[in-house]
């Protein structure tokens, strides 16, 4: 302590001389090398300029303190020749840059000290040192910072100011050096230990802050299920992979693309099956419709065939229906037109008509109504032959079974046979396809049982002809049969024409009229047309030109009581037993060409509605007829031409919700008789009365038996 106080006094006495020598040295620019700086200057510069260094490298700080202490003791009178220190600045530059910041050249002893310092702190991290320096203890440098901060901010060129600053600085240097020596002598612990603990606390706080920030970025959104951390990672990855120009201008679009990528189907390592979109598949199938041969160089025979072609002018009918607000659109109508041409070219068709379109849940049905030429309907003949063989085989097998098994008392109702081809409900043949360009499929003939059951159920079409129809009552067939039954019902109820367009032939006999009405007609060549206003104002100017379907399921009534010879014999036996045969009245419906004004409505709802296609230009408008019983059925007429069209779900209008019919009554399994008739048990009084009546009878029988035995003994 005595050495430190004596050194402090000498330093205060020598400070004025050191300041004068500094200014003289700068003015004279002596070529000689200046003396080495004082140890106090080196220690103060190291403590102020590189304050974090002792905390990062404890070994270096210890060596520097040892060098400073030994330097103070061995400096001698040469200390007074050291120049005054420059103004201090607050920065954390490494120790090896101190010589460049000092305006006065360093002495060899200072270079040696710097070299020792450099070797003592290898691989120092400036980032860690700067962060640790902010949180280190401040009781070592608080006085130095308070004295040097004003000097560094406001440097004055005045000599007096420099002298005062150097005097105050030297005082603080001595005081700080004394404190360091007192700490080194009084305590054996390292002064850097508090700084190490503070750095560890700072690192732990930094890690916690980083974890909290990352947890916030990883928080999942309640709407999209994404988090910001993954999204930013993907955005940056996409930018670095693609490296677009001016990425900062399109970063919003890149972020949107990254979000949209979540909705795309991710491909795996397996080879996925090539899936053709339905639109492309339909386009491929419809391409064949447009690859038709040109008409250049056509022969005269081809021209005659074109003149007698059975292909209808679908585009003309679509033009009129478009005025009524009904149709499929120009594109689809033209494709249907080409599909009908393909149908007429591949089949011997005499007459063809676009019937309409039935909607389905999965696919729709495009329906074509055709009539084959005479003798060309070979498929129908084959079907009839196969059906007859099945009936004959079934009857033979049934006879064999009847011989073996006892006769059943149950009499099944007679099956109503279907109508022959070209008559009744099977007058026309219908082809369907799901999309124009796909193969046309012929629908089977309809049977009365299918029509009767179709009236009791209501099912949506699926678009697949082989689909099963699950309903109650059970439908006898699949969806193709159900579709054919609905087409027959819709045609019978909605196909109408202007009055006088058709007429009955003169060659038909009167017997047909008496039996069941006429079933054929022909076009009237003398038809002059009806005014459009008359067609709209009166429903009597429209007539049905399709036969009415009877409740039996046929257009022509069939008598189920017609019996063969064997059945007549059985009927005679039943009459002898007293059983009366059943009689069924003949079903009669409205005849052909009956005005639609006689049609029955549903609960004050008329069956038909008429209107003009345009009320603004009535002189060029057409008459439009809409069915209320079959929604989707339309008809138009411009006075001379007419056409019918249907587009809908194939269901009849129902005021109330559909309710399936109730099941039929239970059939009696066994005939009732006295042998199996159950009676109530008698009471006690009834049993006693019965016994009283039975006792005299029993006594009389015993007496009779006794007399008989005596007579036998006498005879013996």
UniProtKB/Swiss-Prot annotation:
Coiled-coil blocks: none
The protein's role, per its UniProt record: Functions as part of axonemal radial spoke complexes that play an important role in ciliary motility. Essential for triplet radial spokes (RS1, RS2 and RS3) head assembly in the motile cilia.
Xref: InterPro entries: Radial_spoke
Gene name of the encoded protein: Rsph4a
Disruption phenotype: Mice show hydrocephalus and the tracheal and ependymal cell cilia show clockwise rotation motion instead of planar beating. All three types of radial spoke heads (RS1, RS2 and RS3) are missing in the tracheal cilia.
Keywords: Cell projection, Cilium, Cilium biogenesis/degradation, Cytoplasm, Cytoskeleton, Phosphoprotein
Tissue expression summary: Expressed in the trachea, ependymal cells and oviduct (at protein level). Abesent from sperm (at protein level). Expressed in brain, kidney and testis.
Range of residues in the leader sequence: none
Phosphoserine found at: 395
Gene Ontology CC: 9+2 motile cilium; axoneme; extracellular region; radial spoke; radial spoke head; radial spoke head 1; radial spoke head 2; radial spoke head 3
Assembly and binders: Component of the axonemal radial spoke 1 (RS1) and 2 (RS2) complexes, at least composed of spoke head proteins RSPH1, RSPH3, RSPH9 and the cilia-specific component RSPH4A or sperm-specific component RSPH6A, spoke stalk proteins RSPH14, DNAJB13, DYDC1, ROPN1L and NME5, and the RS1 complex-specific anchor protein IQUB. Interacts with RSPH1. Interacts with RSPH3B. Interacts with RSPH6A. Interacts with RSPH9.
GO process annotations (BP): cilium movement involved in cell motility; epithelial cilium movement involved in extracellular fluid movement; establishment of localization in cell; maintenance of ciliary planar beating movement pattern; radial spoke assembly
Compositional bias of kind Polar residues: 58-72, 90-102, 127-141
Protein name (Swiss-Prot/TrEMBL): Radial spoke head protein 4 homolog A
UniProt-annotated stretches for the region Disordered: 1-167, 374-413, 564-586, 668-716
Family: Belongs to the flagellar radial spoke RSP4/6 family.
């Amino acid at each position: 302590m005595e050495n430190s106080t004596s050194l402090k006094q000498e330093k205060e006495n020598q400070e004025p001389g050191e300041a004068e020598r500094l200014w003289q040295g700068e003015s004279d620019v002596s070529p000689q090398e200046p003396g080495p700086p004082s140890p106090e200057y080196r220690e103060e510069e190291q403590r102020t300029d590189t304050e974090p260094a002792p905390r990062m490298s404890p070994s270096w700080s210890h060596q520097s303190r040892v060098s400073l202490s030994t330097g103070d003791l061995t400096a001698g009178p040469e200390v007074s020749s050291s120049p005054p220190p420059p103004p201090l600045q607050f920065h954390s530059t490494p120790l090896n840059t101190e010589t460049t910041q000092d305006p006065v050249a360093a002495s060899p002893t200072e270079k040696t000290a710097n070299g020792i310092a450099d070797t003592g702190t290898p691989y120092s991290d400036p980032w860690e040192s700067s962060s640790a320096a902010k949180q280190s203890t401040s009781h070592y440098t608080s006085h130095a910072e308070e004295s040097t901060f004003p000097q560094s901010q406001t440097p004055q060129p005045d000599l007096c100011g420099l002298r005062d600053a150097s005097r105050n600085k030297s005082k603080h240097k001595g005081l700080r050096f004394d404190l360091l020596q007192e700490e080194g002598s009084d305590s054996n612990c390292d002064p850097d230990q508090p700084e190490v603990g503070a750095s560890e606390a700072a690192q732990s706080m930094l890690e916690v802050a980083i974890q909290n920030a990352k947890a916030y970025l990883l928080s999942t959104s309640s709407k999209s299920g994404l988090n910001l951390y993954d999204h930013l990672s993907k955005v940056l990855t996409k930018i670095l992979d693609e490296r677009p120009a001016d990425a900062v201008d399109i970063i919003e679009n890149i972020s949107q693309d990254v979000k949209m990528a979540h909705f795309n189907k991710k491909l795996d390592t397996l080879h996925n099956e090539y899936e053709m979109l339905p639109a492309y598949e339909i386009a491929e199938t419809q391409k064949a419709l447009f690859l038709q041969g040109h008409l250049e160089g056509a022969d005269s025979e081809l021209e005659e065939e074109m003149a007698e072609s059975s292909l209808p002018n679908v585009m003309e009918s679509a033009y009129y229906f478009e005025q009524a607000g009904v149709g499929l659109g120009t594109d689809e109508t033209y494709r249907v037109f080409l599909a009908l041409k393909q149908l007429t070219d591949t089949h011997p068709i005499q007459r063809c008509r676009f019937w309409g379109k039935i909607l389905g849940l999965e696919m729709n049905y495009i329906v074509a109504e055709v009539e084959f030429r005479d003798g060309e309907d070979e498929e129908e003949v084959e079907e009839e032959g196969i059906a007859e063989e099945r009936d004959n085989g079934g009857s033979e097998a049934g006879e064999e079974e009847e011989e073996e098994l006892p006769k059943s008392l149950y009499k099944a109702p007679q099956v109503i046979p279907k109508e022959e081809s070209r008559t009744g409900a099977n007058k026309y043949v219908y082809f369907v396809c799901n999309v124009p360009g796909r193969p046309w499929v012929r629908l089977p003939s309809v049977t009365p049982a299918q029509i009767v059951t179709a009236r009791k159920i209501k099912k949506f079409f699926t678009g697949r002809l082989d689909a099963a129809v699950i309903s109650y009552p059970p439908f006898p067939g699949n969806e193709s049969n159900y579709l054919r039954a609905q087409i027959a019902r819709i045609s019978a109820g909605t196909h109408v024409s202007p009055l006088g367009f058709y007429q009955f032939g003169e060659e038909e006999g009167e017997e047909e009229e008496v039996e069941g009405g006429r079933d054929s007609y022909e076009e009237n060549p003398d038809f002059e047309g009806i005014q459009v206003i008359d067609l709209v104002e009166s429903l009597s100017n429209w007539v049905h030109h399709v036969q009415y379907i009877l409740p039996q399921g046929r257009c022509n009534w069939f008598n189920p009581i017609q019996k063969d010879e064997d059945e007549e014999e059985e009927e005679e036996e039943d009459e002898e037993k007293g059983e009366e045969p059943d009689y069924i009245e003949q079903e009669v419906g409205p005849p052909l060409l009956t005005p639609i004004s006689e049609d029955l409505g549903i609960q004050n709802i008329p069956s038909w509605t008429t209107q003009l296609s345009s009320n603004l230009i009535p002189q060029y408008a057409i008459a439009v007829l809409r069915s209320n019983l079959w929604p989707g059925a339309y008809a138009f007429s411009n006075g001379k031409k007419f056409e019918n069209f249907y587009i809908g779900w194939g269901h009849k209008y129902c005021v109330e919700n559909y309710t399936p019919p109730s099941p039929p009554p239970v059939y009696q399994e066994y005939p009732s008789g006295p042998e199996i008739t159950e009676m109530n048990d008698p009471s006690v009084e009834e049993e006693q009365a019965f016994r009283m009546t039975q006792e005299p009878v029993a006594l009389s029988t015993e007496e009779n038996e006794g007399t008989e035995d005596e007579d036998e003994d006498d005879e013996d």
